[in-house]
Amino acid sequence: MELVRDNWTKNDYDDFVEELRSYADEKYRSFHSSLIPDNDKDFFIGVRMPVMRKLGKEISKGNGRSFLEQTTDNSYEEKTIRGIVIGLLKTESYEEFSMYSDDFVQRIDSWAVCDGFCANLKESKKYKSEFFPHVCEYTKSDNPWIIRAGLVLMLDYYLEDEYIDTVLECCDNAKNPHYYVSMARAWLVATALAKCREQTMRYIKSNS
């Protein structure tokens, strides 16, 4: 079907989901769903990430905003493609960008959706300094998936001298016991050690 559209209707989106299902790989579905225990296997269609990226990029050549108005969270793949389109959206203001970001992080329910969204959110570079306090707020949430989103966004975009001290402070304060928060904290510190060694070593010594 044609994915570069000026306008998306519910019927268009339903047709898109049918096309998405045509890319399903049952063996991959079984394997991938086993890596994401937070969702039932039935939540997965079994579409590989390169295919989803290609579809998301094609949709983004048209009216991505109209597509987002029709999207549902009925499958891992639909949710992931929503995140890809948001990441590719050329927003007109920081307010619009943060609205889409906030909306999506509320929908995160697995490490895969979280990390894929964060990695694809290239538009955040356009609003880097404005977005940083917002990312810090994510790490203060009661929702472990929003905390993880904040930590992974810091890992992806803010491991620089200008931000590293605040990043490490946020990491230290994000003490939610959820497994995937703990893993994100460890991942963040390990990556920070490679990129900002001096500051991160001070942080590690102060917490030893």
Model-derived segments and spans:
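Alpha-helical scaffold domains
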Residues: 1-208
